[in-house]
Amino acid sequence: SRTLIKSKLWVGPEIQKEMKLVAPNLDLTVDYGWLWFLSQPLFKLLTIINSIINNWGFSIILITFIMKIITYPLTKSQYVSMSKIRALQPKIKEIKEAFSDNKQRISQEMIILYKKEKINPLGGFLPVFIQMPVFLSLYYMLIGSVELRHAPFVLWIKDLSSQDPFYVLPIIMGLTMFFIQKTSSNNISDPIQKKIMNFMPVIFTVFFLWFPSGLVLYYIVSNLVTIIQQKFIFSNFKSN
């Protein structure tokens, strides 16, 4: 006996707008990794923005601004905590010099100092961990969206899904990252750790040479906004 089974088969690029017309929720088969539940709404927001301004590159810039504004309270908490620790460096240095032969006593005195000044030593790292899923979901969304293929931005960037042919964007990204690390490393007392932090932009620049232009563009804008936020938060902390 024979049984006739009818089914629809999608053969082609994973353009989500067209996939929805074939079958309900077929667009959900686009692989955005384990953070798909964040990447999906971000892509919908990106699509809405692009339908208005009709340029995927500027849409990436705008969605980056939106995400940085949303996560600003966490960023502020991170840099305020860093500023407080930086302000305590003279006292921390005194403690280390006074008890240089007793590491346990140094730890105890540091805890007492942090409690007295109402500082959480992990306060600068917790906001970073909270923000990480958001920015990872942006990463998965940008590399997983076929809509960005052959999508031009401006000037020499003719395809946001491929690497910058002249490596200009990765170099700009490296410079912005270096500026951020230079400011942040002022809070690090360990010279070896400080050197590693200062060298990180070089490593990331090399990696980003082969990253899609759209993804590098996102990191550049994100870093530039971070630099502005750093300046604003640090200057406000000093004035207060």
Curated annotation (Swiss-Prot):
One of the record's GO molecular function terms: membrane insertase activity
TM stretches of this protein: 46-66, 123-143, 160-180, 201-221
GO terms under biological process: protein insertion into membrane; protein transport
Keyword terms: Cell membrane, Chaperone, Membrane, Protein transport, Transmembrane, Transmembrane helix, Transport
Entry membrane topology: Multi-pass membrane protein
One Gene Ontology cellular component: plasma membrane
Subcellular location: Cell membrane
Family that this chain belongs to: Belongs to the OXA1/ALB3/YidC family. Type 1 subfamily.
Function: Required for the insertion and/or proper folding and/or complex formation of integral membrane proteins into the membrane. Involved in integration of membrane proteins that insert both dependently and independently of the Sec translocase complex, as well as at least some lipoproteins. Aids folding of multispanning membrane proteins.
Subunit structure: Interacts with the Sec translocase complex via SecD. Specifically interacts with transmembrane segments of nascent integral membrane proteins during membrane integration.
Protein name, per record: Membrane protein insertase YidC
Native source organism of the sequence: Buchnera aphidicola subsp. Myzus persicae
Lineage, broadest ranks: Bacteria, Pseudomonadati, Pseudomonadota, Gammaproteobacteria, Enterobacterales
Gene name per UniProt: yidC
